[in-house]
Amino acid sequence: MKTTLAAPDERLRAALQHRIDRKTKPLGALGRLEALALQVGLVQQTETPQLRQPHILVFAGDHGAARAGVSAYPQDVTWQMVENFLAGGAAINVFCRQMDLGLSVVDAGVNHDFGKRPGLVDAKIGPGTANYLEAPAMTAAQRDAALERGRGLAHALAANGCNAVGFGEMGIGNTASASLITHCLVGEARGADLATITGRGTGLDDAGLERKRALLARALARGGRPADPRAVLAEYGGFEIAMMAGAMLGAAEKGMLVLVDGFIVTSALLVAHALAPQILPYCVFAHRSREPGHRVQLDALGAEPLMDLDLRLGEGTGAALAWPLVQAAVNFLAEMASFESAGVSDKT
């Protein structure tokens, strides 16, 4: 996948900062909301940013390694949770309804036939990845197809008027995949070994966590640490992770704001960032997950998330919960009076 991504033009920064500073408040009094308003303005290249048709994309895919016992739940939970999303019964559905966010579920590679369903995007690459304990998770052709399909989904959202997209995922075993990706791309540079990055995922007990760590060590011994991020993705990734990476790049290409959820979503961003480092200014990091590897990822990207609520659900729930903060940042910039317009005396 080739991308022509460019970082936002910084020439607007001074004008935006002046506009923020002249609001009726002490300098910096709105804290990180001020930086967020500045970021959205730079992404949209305007002093008066607007949020249009915000949407959450939840990418679902199965993992061959799940059958080896890297998760506390059976693989069938992936398709069952997709059905739950489509029925409106999951946490992400509740939060999207509350925040008035659009929601689409993307079948990137679930081992189930859903048929044509409202709210479901059929982008299936295959019925789950191969078991990376035995072979690469996907072929180069499958990886490239997933990246391109993700890119196309983001472009389609932009064509329909969306300028802010949040990312979520569902896939039993995908915290294991995210751990391997994270270790290969940033773990060694951050002094974090694979065992440190690997967490409990869906709730493994101590014995389950040790089994997961041992299985991932076996996978790493087989596949090694490829230098090319595309090779890392093919070796250990999931179809949902690959498709998210492509969609993130596609969203940034269209000048969209990218809301980053937790550990698995950030593993997709690590791939996207390795392919196009200019993506970072487009990204709003919603929260810090309880997964230990998420802190490693955030540190590697120099990111400070908006919230720390001990979330570890995925689905894009953190992105949805952070949305009102993004709205607040844009709204104060648009609606708050300046010292001049309000006739309020400035600091002497």
From Swiss-Prot:
It comes from the Bacteria. Keywords: Cobalamin biosynthesis, Glycosyltransferase, Transferase. It catalyses: 5,6-dimethylbenzimidazole + nicotinate beta-D-ribonucleotide = alpha-ribazole 5'-phosphate + nicotinate + H(+). It is an enzyme of class 2 (transferase). The keyword S-adenosyl-L-methionine does not apply. Gene3D superfamilies: 1.10.1610.10, 3.40.50.10210. The active site is at E315 (proton acceptor). The keyword Glycosyltransferase applies. It comes from Azoarcus sp. (strain BH72). Pfam families: DBI_PRT (PF02277). This is Nicotinate-nucleotide--dimethylbenzimidazole phosphoribosyltransferase. Belongs to the CobT family. Catalyzes the synthesis of alpha-ribazole-5'-phosphate from nicotinate mononucleotide (NAMN) and 5,6-dimethylbenzimidazole (DMB). Its EC number is 2.4.2.21. One of its GO terms (molecular function) is nicotinate-nucleotide-dimethylbenzimidazole phosphoribosyltransferase activity. GO terms for biological process: cobalamin biosynthetic process. PANTHER family: NICOTINATE-NUCLEOTIDE--DIMETHYLBENZIMIDAZOLE PHOSPHORIBOSYLTRANSFERASE.
